[in-house]
Amino acid sequence: LSDYQEQYGDLYNLEATPAESTTYRLAKHDRKRWPGIKTAGKPGDTPYYTNSSHLPVDYTVDIFDALDIQDELQTLYTSGTVFHAFLGEKLPDWKAAASLVRTIASNYKLPYYTLSPTYSICKEHGYLAGEVKVCPHCGAKTEVYSRITGYYRPVQNWNDGKLQEYANRTEYDIDHSSLKRPTRSVVTLSNFAEDVEV
């Protein structure tokens, strides 16, 4: 990019665009035009494409396997990139979240990442951790929220392609994930989770 910037006198940017609705729209049009084309998911699924250079949504349950691959790819972009850690239910507490963030920040060069739990809302009882379709307290139907790309929306409002992606999504299992690379030596706030009072 810097060569082109120098040659043409313009600024260029390499970005992993989110493509919220086009991942489905383009895959649907491509499937219609070329019935045998490969799209994300399994045969018979509603067609969709995986966002930018993200891994297939069902690639692994080990967050560090995914981070190892994405760390090499996403650092090539000059902006507009993010790694979403889809966690299903929330982490047990803020200390677990702080520990995971510290581990990622200490061992990876990724510029942006999110911890993205799924949660549900009951009109009567409020917040419920994870995907809970029926409130355990009153039996009412809930609204399930998850990150569609850069923001949260009720899953019921997603387009068919994003719904298929959500159905195929494998959530990272933090308890059964293991860091395989040697720990990098970086300056961090020592024992952050233990020292901070809430």
Language-model-detected regions and their locations in the chain:
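Long, C-terminal-biased catalytic regions of enzyme "large/alpha" subunits
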Residues: L1-V198
